[in-house]
């Protein structure tokens, strides 16, 4: 891989790596290598879901994908933004880079992987910069951090008489 990584630890592909919040939790607990849930051409199969259920016994339904390709892509873009923001704000990485890697997992045949929708999925993960969803999430971050304000006043006897004036003057100033 051409990317830097802090530790070779992280979740293997599975249902737990298909949702953004699970990827974020794994990151916060030290995961840095994320093998994303395997996606495939047949993203609308009707199978028992969740694919893995272990309430009293465990089973796994193969050839299953709980989210469509577009839903999977959206989850990975959300996670990507969240991890970058967390790292930038809280400096989790000691590297000059992000220190984590997303690794795609695709299946299950070459013919399936070569289909138009799978190829689009792969190419959009390789370079998301022109994808509308990536641009939308990038634009969500607002420049205005606070649009409202609360003015506090001392409540001694003299100030109580002038609170009305103070509110007017502070409101006009802001």
Predicted regions and their residues:
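Active-site entrance/lid segments in N-terminal catalytic domains of soluble metabolic enzymes
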Residues: 1, 13-174
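Short, basic, glycine/proline-bearing loop/turn elements
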Residues: 3-10
